[in-house]
């Protein structure tokens, strides 16, 4: 069971839908979040893409030397970069980071944004182009280890004698992650990706998606691993956690929610439609309306695109819900929380000890100063509490 965190390159705050409590997405701040994740024992971080985000490859590259073991799940958008250039970019990053690159293929679902980026393809065509893109990307990198070139003649993309002179550390190529809820997305995942990633839907819905992708992959003689993308709001008690959830959306008004939901409704993303369906366009915002499954809260999705649900509860309850998803076949959990720096610590401190995960060996010298809290009376090292 691997735990990932999230680099908030599209902004961070204590509240949704307001500039109150907002933080600047500076080089210093994203470095703080990455270093915290690395120090706390998260396996990696997801770095998103889109016009609302800083460029994921620039951000990820800036964090290589600030971290020691952290893996970088970097978003890659077909249509914004030629596959051969994407292969060179990925290979350079993988070498410079010592083999810490993971790639998240993002097809995109906001037609307005896509057209602004010069991509004028419908839903079916985008998946065709994405499949061709990632095939070329994979094969160019795989061929680099033997020094061979690669040809491809597809409907949307073609390369002739494509060659990568400097191969990746990871063989045959850095692992490819991908998420999508349509049949076309499941087909692409089954054929080409290593980890299928789903947003945090109720367990029954997640189980259906896993079964679909797993069945399609098995028919091709392939196996995949599975991940889930969620927010988390954990506190020492259930009451405190739900109060924090209410606080997160306390600045939202009907106009802001309606504008956000109208924007989401214009997208042709099946996954985004599934997220929106969980909260009925935000017409009501009580816990009873937004708790769509035990401890699974859809409040984030009122105004945030993409992953719109959070696990909410005390440490024991959150750990139990995580284990329920793991029992479905989820191997990797990608979490985030507002604000991302403090919540990275809170989640790791409260929930990590309760999970059946591999505890990383501490780096040399890392344990010499704790963690054990502040020394008592200048002479006594604190012990764990009895509770």
UniProtKB/Swiss-Prot annotation:
Top EC class of this enzyme: oxidoreductase
Entry's EC annotation: 1.14.14.5
UniProt function note: Catalyzes the desulfonation of aliphatic sulfonates.
A single MF term (Gene Ontology): alkanesulfonate monooxygenase activity
Enzymatic reactions: an alkanesulfonate + FMNH2 + O2 = an aldehyde + FMN + sulfite + H2O + 2 H(+)
UniProt cross-references to PANTHER family, sorted A to Z: ALKANESULFONATE MONOOXYGENASE, ALKANESULFONATE MONOOXYGENASE-RELATED
Pfam families: Bac_luciferase
GO biological process assignments: alkanesulfonate catabolic process
Gene3D superfamilies: Luciferase-like domain
Organism annotation: Xanthomonas axonopodis pv. citri (strain 306)
Family, as annotated: Belongs to the SsuD family.
Gene name for this UniProt entry: ssuD
Keywords (A to Z) from UniProt: Flavoprotein, FMN, Monooxygenase, Oxidoreductase
First and last residue of the signal peptide: none
Xref: HAMAP family: Alkanesulf_monooxygen
Top-level taxonomic group: Bacteria
UniProt xrefs under InterPro entries: Alkanesulphonate_mOase_FMN-dep, Luciferase-like_dom, Luciferase-like_sf, SsuD_RutA_monooxygenase
Protein name: Alkanesulfonate monooxygenase
């Amino acid at each position: 069971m691997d735990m990932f965190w999230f680099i908030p390159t599209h902004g961070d705050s204590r509240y949704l839908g307001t500039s109150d409590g907002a933080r600047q997405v500076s080089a210093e701040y994203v470095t703080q979040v990455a270093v915290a994740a690395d120090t706390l024992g998260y396996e990696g971080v997801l770095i998103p893409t889109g016009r609302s985000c800083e460029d994921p490859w620039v951000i990820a590259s800036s964090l290589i030397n600030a971290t020691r073991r952290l893996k970088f799940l970097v978003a890659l958008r077909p249509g914004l970069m030629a596959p051969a250039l994407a292969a060179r970019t990925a290979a350079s990053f993988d070498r410079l980071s010592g083999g810490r690159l993971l790639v998240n293929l993002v097809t995109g679902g906001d037609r307005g944004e896509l057209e602004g980026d010069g991509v004028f393809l419908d839903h079916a065509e985008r998946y065709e182009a994405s499949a061709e893109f990632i095939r070329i990307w994979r094969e160019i990198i795989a061929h680099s280890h033997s020094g061979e070139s690669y040809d491809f003649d597809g409907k949307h993309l073609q390369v002739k004698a494509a060659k990568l002179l400097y191969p990746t550390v990871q063989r045959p190529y850095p692992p490819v992650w991908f998420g999508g809820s349509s049949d076309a997305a499941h087909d692409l995942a089954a054929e080409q990706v290593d980890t299928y990633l789903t947003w945090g839907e109720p367990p029954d819905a997640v189980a259906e998606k896993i079964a679909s992708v797993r069945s399609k992959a098995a028919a091709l003689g392939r196996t995949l691993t599975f991940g889930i993308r969620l927010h988390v709001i954990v506190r020492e008690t259930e009451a405190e956690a739900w109060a924090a959830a209410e606080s997160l959306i306390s600045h939202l008004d009907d106009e802001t929610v309606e504008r956000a939901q109208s924007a989401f409704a214009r997208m042709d993303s099946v996954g985004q439609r599934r997220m929106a369906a969980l909260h009925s366009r935000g017409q009501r915002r009580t816990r009873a309306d937004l708790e769509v499954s035990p401890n699974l809260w859809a409040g984030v999705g009122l105004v945030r695109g993409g992953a719109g649900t959070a696990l909410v509860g005390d440490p024991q309850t959150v750990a139990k819900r995580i284990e329920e998803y793991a029992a479905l076949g989820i191997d990797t959990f990608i979490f985030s929380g507002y604000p991302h720096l403090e919540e990275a610590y809170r989640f790791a401190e409260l929930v990590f000890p309760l999970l059946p995960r591999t505890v990383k060996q501490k780096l040399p010298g890392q344990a010499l100063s704790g963690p054990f809290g502040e020394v008592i009376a200048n002479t006594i090292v604190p012990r764990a509490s009895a509770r």
